[in-house]
């Protein structure tokens, strides 16, 4: 067992609750001790929605431990069924309450006798899966449940829609810029003359799941959520799916060409090449910007990328292929899908890191000293400590990455947003230098940022003054090189002589 003060992907029950609370009129009952029930607070704080989070905690306390949980859990399910009239109630334990080894499936069967809506137990192993895997499995389970139910009743649609249509699978609550991506994907589909049949799970009704087979194909924009469902629909109903994430000019074009291929295979005659050309050359600013002098200033600059599989792979490709930036390290915390990630990014970066240990990533960033980091909220903290700018490109994220303004990452507008984020993340050296020289408005003294948060070396007055004369955008590097030299030679105080010796040693 490992103590972690930062987790990139949460425990399994968070994934299940994300799916349940994404659907319309679905309620979740969480069988958990106090302390595991933070999902309501987290979602209410982060998602900018007016509705309450439809999750109730059935608390495991000493009375429950003494008498067993059945009575309390069944009562809570039946009570919520009467109060809220949900279409579906999903019961989920947490990793803590799983220790009790109770027969929750039996509780669900018992509650179903008295409940008017459907009741389901989330079928997830809480010790084997994390938040992302559990979300994928829960979505698959709900879709399968309702399609099988419709099949028994003979309610499945027998024909496809007349016009080409798509199901967008994987848009969920608490996802990284998911709502914005959904809007952009709907626009993209409209531009291509494709109707959106269903978007699941966000805002979907479980009663509409029976309509999923009407679509011509499925689009899975995020690798973490939706692949299991798309695989099931392909196996049962012969529905093809596109799992190319449309992020960046190149990948968006590849995604559209794959859609064209699937639609034409079903009898339509579409040609999207003119649309791709028009968008790439004239509508999206990213292709033009990447050839401008501003972007050429970034050529060869070093960057580190870290995040979930989808976003880390997409950003790595954009940096290397479309902007000429040198990616020294690309990493993901999705260890369960590491082979796919390696295959996607290995030709675009020097080093691949598969880890969910934030200290390992922090150490790698400190060792590589990139000009910018593109990562999660945690890499932002690391960047602040090391004085390296960071653009946030993947979950886990905090409130500032749930923007009110329109900021998609997918599609052609997404490429503009990503390009802005990348360019603005690199510190413009001259700007930094001028601020230091002139001190800005009403600044009494120049503020110097220390790089080492816990440096064990002392700088004497003369050496500190000399260090302050070094331009801000290289000062961090000079300080780190000098301290490294001092440690290797056994100096505890850094003087001017030590500084000059260090400078000679690194050949600067």
From Swiss-Prot:
It catalyses: chlorophyllide a + oxidized 2[4Fe-4S]-[ferredoxin] + 2 ADP + 2 phosphate = protochlorophyllide a + reduced 2[4Fe-4S]-[ferredoxin] + 2 ATP + 2 H2O. The active site is at residue 294. Keywords: 4Fe-4S, ATP-binding, Chlorophyll biosynthesis, Iron, Iron-sulfur, Metal-binding, Nucleotide-binding, Oxidoreductase, Photosynthesis. Transmembrane segments: none annotated. [4Fe-4S] cluster binds at residue 36. It is an enzyme of class 1 (oxidoreductase). Pathway: Porphyrin-containing compound metabolism; chlorophyll biosynthesis (light-independent). GO terms for molecular function: 4 iron, 4 sulfur cluster binding; ATP binding; metal ion binding; oxidoreductase activity, acting on iron-sulfur proteins as donors; oxidoreductase activity, acting on the CH-CH group of donors, iron-sulfur protein as acceptor. Substrate binds at residues 429-430. Its cofactor is [4Fe-4S] cluster. NCBIfam families: DPOR_BchB. Protochlorophyllide reductase is composed of three subunits; ChlL, ChlN and ChlB. Forms a heterotetramer of two ChlB and two ChlN subunits. This is Light-independent protochlorophyllide reductase subunit B. The lineage of its organism: Bacteria, Bacillati, Cyanobacteriota, Cyanophyceae, Oscillatoriophycideae. The gene is chlB.
């Amino acid at each position: 067992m490992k103590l972690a003060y930062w987790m990139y992907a949460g425990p399994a029950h968070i994934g299940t609750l994300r799916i349940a609370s994404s659907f319309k009129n679905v309620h979740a009952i969480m069988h958990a001790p106090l302390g595991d029930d933070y999902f309501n607070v987290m979602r209410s704080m982060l998602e900018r929605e007016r509705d309450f989070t439809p999750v109730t905690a059935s608390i495991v306390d000493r009375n429950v431990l003494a008498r067993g949980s059945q009575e309390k859990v069944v009562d809570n399910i039946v009570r919520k069924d009467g109060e809220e009239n949900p279409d579906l109630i999903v019961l989920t334990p947490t990793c803590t309450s799983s220790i009790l080894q109770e027969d929750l499936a039996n509780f669900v069967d018992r509650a179903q006798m008295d409940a008017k809506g459907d009741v389901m137990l989330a079928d997830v192993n809480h010790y084997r899966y994390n938040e992302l895997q559990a979300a994928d499995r829960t979505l698959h389970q709900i879709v399968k449940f309702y399609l099988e139910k419709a099949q028994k009743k003979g309610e499945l649609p027998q024909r496809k829609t007349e016009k080409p249509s798509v199901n967008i699978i994987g848009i969920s609550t608490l996802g990284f810029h998911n709502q914005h991506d959904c809007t952009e994907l709907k626009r993209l589909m409209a531009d291509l003359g494709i109707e959106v049949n269903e978007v699941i799970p966000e805002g979907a009704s479980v009663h509409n799941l029976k309509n999923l087979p009407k679509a011509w194909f499925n689009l899975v924009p995020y690798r973490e959520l939706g692949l299991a469902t798309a695989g099931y629909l392909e196996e049962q109903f012969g529905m093809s799916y596109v799992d190319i994430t449309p992020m960046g000019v190149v990948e968006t074009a590849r995604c559209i060409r794959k859609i064209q291929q699937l639609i034409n295979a079903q009898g339509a005659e579409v040609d999207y090449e003119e649309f791709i050309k028009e968008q790439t050359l004239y509508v999206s600013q990213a292709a033009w910007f990447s050839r401008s002098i501003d972007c050429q200033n970034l050529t060869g600059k070093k960057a580190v990328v870290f995040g979930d599989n989808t976003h880390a792979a997409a950003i790595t490709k954009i940096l290397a292929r479309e902007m000429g930036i040198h990616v020294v390290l690309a990493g993901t915390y999705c260890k369960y899908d590491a082979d796919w990630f390696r295959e996607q990014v290995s030709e675009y970066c020097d080093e691949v890191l598969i880890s969910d240990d934030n200290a390992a990533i922090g150490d790698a960033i400190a060792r590589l000293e990139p000009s910018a980091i593109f990562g999660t909220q945690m890499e932002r903290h690391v960047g602040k400590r090391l004085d390296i700018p960071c653009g946030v490109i993947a979950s886990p994220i905090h409130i500032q990455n749930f923007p009110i303004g329109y900021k998609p990452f997918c599609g052609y507008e997404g490429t503009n947003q990503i390009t802005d984020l990348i360019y603005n993340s690199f510190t413009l050296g001259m700007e930094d230098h001028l601020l230091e020289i002139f001190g800005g408005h009403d600044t009494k003294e120049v503020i110097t940022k220390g790089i080492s948060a816990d440096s064990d070396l002392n700088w004497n007055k003369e050496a500190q003054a000399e260090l302050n004369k070094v331009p801000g955008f290289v000062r961090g590097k000079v300080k780190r090189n000098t301290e490294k030299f001092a440690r290797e030679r056994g100096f505890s105080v850094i003087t001017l002589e030590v500084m000059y010796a260090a400078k000679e040693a690194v050949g600067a």
